[in-house]
Amino acid sequence: MQKKNKPINSYESKHSSKREKDLFYSLCDKNHDVIKTENFKQTLLKSGLKKNDNRLYSLFQMLDTFGKEIYYDDFIKIISSAGLLVEKALRGELALPDFSDFSKNVDEMFKEVAKNKSGELASYIPPLAKVDPDQFGISIVTVDGQVYQRGDFNEDFSIQSMCKPFNYCFALEELGLDEVHKHVGQEPSGRKFNDLTLLVRSSEGFQNNSTNIPFNPMINAGAIMTTGLINSDETYEKRFNFIKNEFAKLIGWTAKGKFDSKFPRFNKDVAREENFTGYHNMAIGYLLMETGNLPDKENNHKKKVNQKHDNFDFYNEPSVTEALKLYFSVCSLEMTATEVAMAAATLANNGVCPVTQDRVLNQKTVRDCLPILQSSGMYDASGAFFQQVGLPAKSGVGGGVFLVIPQLMGICIFSPRLDKQGNSVRGIEMAKQITSKYLVHMFDGAMTNADRIDPRIPISRWRANSCGEAIWAASNGDI
């Protein structure tokens, strides 16, 4: 039954505070001590939070029981049960305090970048050569779980090399930094992602050679190595299931509301085609085995002897074939831009998934991963990309690019047309547009620029700061 409108003072108790009262009044209809339930919902949604967010799931169910209006005592119950997230959203104190303004700006960037039709599909993997080249989507997830989506954000696409930093993280979690880097280096290669050249360690430092360890975990050789390190004593099935389950945690699939996430999908056709055409990767696999750095799986096949005098059993090294099979399988997982953005936001949030609040990765693992991502994540264009965009990022030939803005957000752009380095053309352009509009480059620091916005502060405060700085400069003759 709907409650009668009572004077707000009659509800004051030890459970209420001036802060809560001020917040209630700020949401009330003019001249009424009541909040419209629909307005309350819309305020939360306009802040960038989603109705199917695990943390708001119970709240929205509760709101449906209040009818059309919320009175002060019910408001106190809501605030008490919903936790800090709702209060921050209502006060405009989430990671992006002006989510609407941010969304409008990214909308404009999206429209502009959509005009770019340059680039080619990844023709060397047949299923990827058949995708719609005009697909274009973006999703942005903040560390507070705010979500921006535009275009084909809900289309499945092959993550390909975007899996590499996460596989590296899984290996770090299992073995630790020192052990992993006995098998793979930390240096930018400056070479194509599938180059066969490895890195040699000697007393005189590092030098190029055809043997020893891969340069870093973000090129194919390094990714095959780190994938081979994950649960190396287990069967392929157990290892692949483990990796899929870890990705599910990263993208928030375990949340009650499922947050627009599905369990990672395996595209067997893509994996098979990579197997049929991946001779270069097979060569890398055997090269890694020859160096002695790929974990050796025990098997009795070597002991078998073909009894025919003019025949023998040709031996394929199972350590290589299984590492490659697992690597091809993980590259062939499909996700949406929103799911990948959630995984990127988990990295931005020091390993804690924004919507489940579960710690998926140790903070040290994330800290160790992001520098490698920054120096080597965009193939042989990594240096130029970081100079221009200034953010850790990873691309894949399926058309995806994700970016990590530490302590703020994860971004994923999907557009399958690629440049000569194998990076999404629109993905790179969109990343450049975002960092040209917003002060998110890692080396912006305290830099001020009247044309660039700090997304972490309310737009009104940013404008006031810019105006104040202009007045101060003018008063000192610096105009």
Q: What does each of the following model-derived ranges do?
A:
Residues 145, 158-178, 343, 411:
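Active-site SXXK
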Residues 111-150, 402-403:
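A short, well-structured edge-of-sheet supersecondary motif
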Residues 11-34, 51-69:
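Primarily EF-hand calcium-binding motifs
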Residues 63-94:
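EF-hand and EF-hand-like Ca2+-sensor regions
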Residues 89-108, 118, 171-299, 310-330, ...:
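Active-site-adjacent helix/loop patches that line small-molecule binding or acyl-intermediate pockets
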Residues 34-51, 71-83:
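Amphipathic regulatory helices of Ca2+-sensor modules
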Residues 7-15, 21, 31, 40, ...:
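Structured C-terminal helix/loop/strand segments within mature extracytoplasmic catalytic/sensor domains
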